Amino acid sequence: MGDETRIYHGRWRNAEYGEEYYAEVALATLPRDRWGALGLYPEGSTQLGKLEGWVWSAPVTLPAEGCRVVLNAEHPELMRVEISDAGFNLLPGYSDSNSGTPQKGSLDCAVACPSGDLAALGGKQVRIRVHMQRDGASDPRLFAIYLRSDS
């Protein structure tokens, strides 16, 4: 609902109910799409405490009219976004020095690309790669990637 995920839960037993049985319903709220996250291994991990890493999306077909990439993330300033074709071949206009960088935010971090929007890739199947880099005590977390139409 809006910027929240609401989870209603209650007490339930798979048994006969006696006179002393009672039930309660509770509500847990989380920021939108924050049920799980992708991040880097913890810094203290034996060999896996890497300072950087990345994650690839499944192939997606971009809307013909173009769209924007928006991240739901913690510490989005420690991330950058690249676009490849469905075969993992990075696209020159959307990778390396042309990577998109998320603007400050949290639930809706718009990604600014030097090459502009993704209208040139409309109707094509692509993958999105999100790079993450740890910076001191700041640990980036990616919760969701959205493709938003400007219309």
Q: Where are each of the predicted segments found?
A:
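Short beta-strands within extracellular/lumenal beta-sheet-rich domains
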Residues: 39-66, 78-80, 108-116, 137-143
